[in-house]
Amino acid sequence: MRPAFEPAAGLGRAHPHETTPRSIDADVAIIGAGPVGLMIANILGLQGVRVVVVEKLTQIIDYPRAIGLDDEALRVFQSVGLAEALLPHTTPNHWMRFTLNGKCFASIEPRTDEFGWPRRNAFIQPLADQILYRGLERFDHVSTLLGHNVDRFAQDESGVTIDATDAHGVRTTIRAAYMVGADGGNSFVRRTLDVPFEGRTKPNQWIVIDVRNDPIGSPHVYLHCDARRPYVSAALPHGIRRFEFMVMPGETEEELSKPENMAALVRGVVDDPDKVDYIRQRVYTHNARLASVFRVKRILLAGDAAHIMPVWQGQGYNSGIRDASNLGWKLAMVVKGTARDALLDTYTMERRAHARSMIHLSEVAGDIFAPTSFVGTRVRDAFVRCFDVLPSLKRYFVEMRFKPMPRYEDGVVLLARRARSEGMLARLIASRGHGAFGRLVGLMSEKRESLLGRIVHGRDAQAGTPVGRMYIQPRVRVADGSIVRLDDAIGNRFAILSWGTDPTFGLTPEARRIWSALGGCFVLAKPDPQLGFRDDVPEDVIAIGDVDSRLRDWFARVPESVVLLRPDRFVAGMCSPQCVSECVSQLAQRLSLSVATGAQADDATFAPAAGLVGA
């Protein structure tokens, strides 16, 4: 990675105190060096895409915002080769416990690891962001411009022109084929594009207090549903604890930040408030907003620039990383000429609906934890008492069965397009944002396969299909006998994975040409004891052993035995071994594939195991 004042390789150099204007050419310009912008830059960097990251601050933000990292986000860190560097700064299996009147009435503690990582993890965000930033040092074709403010930008039919100025008044003009606005909730890019950012702002604020030398020491995160002043107590890595207290009417940040008032806040939580080692405190407001579109021609929005949500489920950070995972490989294909830019339309199709669901999830968690009215508090308390007599309801809650998992019904998935229900009940549910109960019902109805989902939206013939969902990541054995996670075994690329049969048998020359253009691979999964037998494995097929029988169990639950995987590890399609060629052709259409010759395919090859997102 080039330093802030140095353009990408081959584009000339500039002294940090140079006073003459300069120009930089790139494939993609990213505005904002937060976690989403940095992750996209790493994904594109691994694909050889020329990237410029522009950040108005002179350094990466060093104070923590997010504290929760889920399994999907860790899988994306894995895909860019940075998961192992991040792990020392995480606490796996970080449960969330709700308490009322001193009693824990629910503990969210999912114990599955279907995507290869623990589902809930605490982490230190500034250290994660630094890992992403240092990860860019691997790429001579990625440059960063810290301390540069974007003054204006304009797009035309062939690209985007960006004018940025540093603290010395030196202007830099960037010309890029595409631009990504990852510049936060108050996004200059989104506001300049005049993209509506609809939603609501909670009336109450919260003060966040981070302390060193954890004065409590107990693990996990506790949400104390105290009617007088709800508060959060979260254990974080490296002896850090976070407290969050609701700001009551009439209180101000200035007053609460005084040492004596912070001591008063923590007095009921710690033994000695005078011995607390404070790091920092900040007051923030909960917002729930969603951009109407994520793409405007050659400019795309990601992360908080596209959606912001309350913190209660820790999904703001994770949703942004999902954006990066979805967008990165698509941008790489388009700028390399492998696909037409119609592929970028699928970014909004696939990500916006799930971002909306995560906003609803976060709001519902907030409704349970901190109702904004006396009536809401009473309803919450009655709901909690139901847990004692309805264990199935409690299990539904504590196992996070309510969490909407990404499911793409349109975009780069081989599913029949169908109209959604527009009946009276569906329209009523669409107005769920007008009350806590409505939001809860609306959230539960978003799972189409659930009873409530069927009542609201009608029977979903595709509810049980894995197509459009993230694929599992079990441990597998590779040819040298080592055991690795699935994504590390097959590389960061498209993959055709079959169970027990050669995925290339009967493949037409046209299908092979398409798959070669995509840089895809072929994978044969076997029961682990059979891995030593190679006579049934062609040279161009990767054989893997199913160490824990998870692949066998997965295929046993579906009617087809061949799965087409995208670089972000979502299932693009499924078929029988005799229909692979047809599925490949259909996938090429959904990808808006433009590569037509072997020569072009050579330039479009996707990186192996250390490479792109979620492979």
From Swiss-Prot:
Keywords of the record: Aromatic hydrocarbons catabolism, FAD, Flavoprotein, NAD, Oxidoreductase
Pathway: Aromatic compound metabolism; 3-phenylpropanoate degradation
Co-factor requirement: FAD
Biological-process GO terms, alphabetical: 3-(3-hydroxy)phenylpropionate catabolic process; 3-phenylpropionate catabolic process
Chain positions covered by the region annotation Disordered: 1-20
Reaction catalyzed: 3-(3-hydroxyphenyl)propanoate + NADH + O2 + H(+) = 3-(2,3-dihydroxyphenyl)propanoate + NAD(+) + H2O; (2E)-3-(3-hydroxyphenyl)prop-2-enoate + NADH + O2 + H(+) = (2E)-3-(2,3-dihydroxyphenyl)prop-2-enoate + NAD(+) + H2O
Binding site for FAD: 27-56, 294-304
One Pfam match: FAD_binding_3
InterPro entries cross-referenced by the UniProt entry: 3-HPP/3HCI_hydroxylase (IPR023786), FAD-bd (IPR002938), FAD/NAD-bd_sf (IPR036188), PheA/TfdB_FAD_monoxygenase (IPR050631)
The protein's Enzyme Commission number: 1.14.13.127
Record's function text: Catalyzes the insertion of one atom of molecular oxygen into position 2 of the phenyl ring of 3-(3-hydroxyphenyl)propionate (3-HPP) and hydroxycinnamic acid (3HCI).
Family as reported in the entry's similarity comment: Belongs to the PheA/TfdB FAD monooxygenase family.
Protein name: 3-(3-hydroxy-phenyl)propionate/3-hydroxycinnamic acid hydroxylase 1
Species the sequence originates in: Burkholderia vietnamiensis (strain G4 / LMG 22486)
Gene: mhpA1
